[in-house]
């Protein structure tokens, strides 16, 4: 049986819901919105990473943007920042306990991406055969 997701009766695509500020979807959107946040969270699912390691995995992100996105994820409680008292300075980023709760969602997004890509490629092949 398909699970029904509760929606406030005031929620419609063309009107603003009176529960907008407390809506779980609004909250979730707020914490993961950002061009690089989902990828940062994805890369942190396996192990803590240093800033430079994240930067290498995300070559198109600027240093300033990566710093801002990490800071935002830290402020929202999804990412922990650990500073080691060594010279040169060493800082590692990892998922917090609440951040680890997002791993199943990221895995679902990954699986959806695989399925979507396979379907798009199949449809492209069918279109090529029709030409």
Whereabouts are the PLM-identified features?
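Residues within the DNA-recognition helix of helix-turn-helix
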Residues: 69
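N-terminal helix-turn-helix DNA-binding core of bacterial DNA-binding proteins
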Residues: 19-65, 85, 92
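Amphipathic, positively biased hydrophobic alpha-helical segments used for protein targeting
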Residues: 33, 44-45, 88, 103, ...
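C-terminal regulatory/oligomerization modules of transcriptional regulators
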Residues: 1-22, 75, 80, 97-131
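Beta-hairpin "wing" of winged helix-turn-helix
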Residues: 74-94
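The DNA-recognition helices of helix-turn-helix-type DNA-binding domains
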Residues: 47, 61, 73, 113-116
């Amino acid at each position: 049986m398909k699970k029904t997701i509760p929606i406030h009766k005031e929620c419609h695509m063309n009107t603003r819901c009176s529960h907008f500020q407390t809506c779980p979807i609004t909250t979730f959107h707020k914490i993961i919105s950002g061009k690089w946040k989902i990828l940062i969270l994805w890369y942190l699912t396996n192990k803590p990473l240093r800033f430079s390691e994240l930067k290498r995995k995300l070559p198109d992100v600027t240093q300033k943007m990566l710093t801002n996105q990490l800071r935002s994820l830290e402020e929202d409680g999804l990412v922990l920042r650990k500073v080691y008292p060594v010279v040169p300075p060493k800082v590692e980023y990892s998922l917090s306990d609440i951040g680890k709760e997002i791993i199943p969602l990221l895995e679902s997004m990954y699986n959806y991406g695989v399925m979507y890509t396979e379907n798009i490629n199949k449809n492209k092949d069918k279109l090529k055969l029709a030409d």
